[in-house]
Amino acid sequence: MAGFIGKERHALDEKGRLMIPVRFRRELSPESTGRGSTIYLMKAPDGSIELYEPDIWEGMKKSLAVLSDFNPEERLLKTMIYESLDVVAIDRQGRVPFSREFLEHAGIVRDVVIIGADTKMIVWAPERLSLLVMENAERYSSLARRYF
């Protein structure tokens, strides 16, 4: 898999479903494109919604499994992640349904921007993404110099 790369603008349909862009559907694993395929949705702390294929989520789940329920910080992290997680079916047309809870979390009414971020897709309300980019332009420059 080459990974999800790029940015697409789309609109949810009247039932709150997102059509996965063709360029991203091509990158889905065969297990994620057949009948009964699923995708994991997570309400990200930054106000976006992240979409993970099952095989990617399984790797993340293993990382969470080693955290101790007896360590308050680790237990809190697990609770917060699992509270923000859902698994939904991708329909035959490649649509992903979003619950009202997820749409409200992200401030999404109809239009969205989908960013391919290698192993995941990140869904933003356009206004929130524009504000994030504008408010963090200098910080981005500093981070890019530090890590690249």
Curated annotation (Swiss-Prot):
- Give this protein's Gene Ontology molecular function annotations: DNA-binding transcription factor activity; transcription cis-regulatory region binding
Which Gene Ontology terms of cellular component type are present?
Answer: cytoplasm; nucleoid
**Record bears the keyword Protease:** no
GO terms for biological process, alphabetical: negative regulation of DNA-templated transcription initiation
Indicate the principal place this protein occupies in or around the cell.
cytoplasm
Q: Where's it found, cell-wise?
A: Cytoplasm, Nucleoid
Keyword annotations for this protein, in alphabetical order, are: Cytoplasm, DNA-binding, Repeat, Transcription, Transcription regulation
Q: Does the keyword Cell cycle apply?
A: no
Instruction: Cite the SpoVT-AbrB domain residue spans from the record.
Output: 7-56, 85-128
Q: Fetch the InterPro entries from UniProt.
A: MraZ, MraZ_C, MraZ_dom, MraZ_N, MraZ_sf, SpoVT-AbrB_dom, SpoVT-AbrB_sf
The family annotation for this protein states: Belongs to the MraZ family.
Q: Which NCBIfam families match?
A: PRK00326.2-2
| Oligomer status and interactors | Forms oligomers.
- Listed name of the protein: Transcriptional regulator MraZ
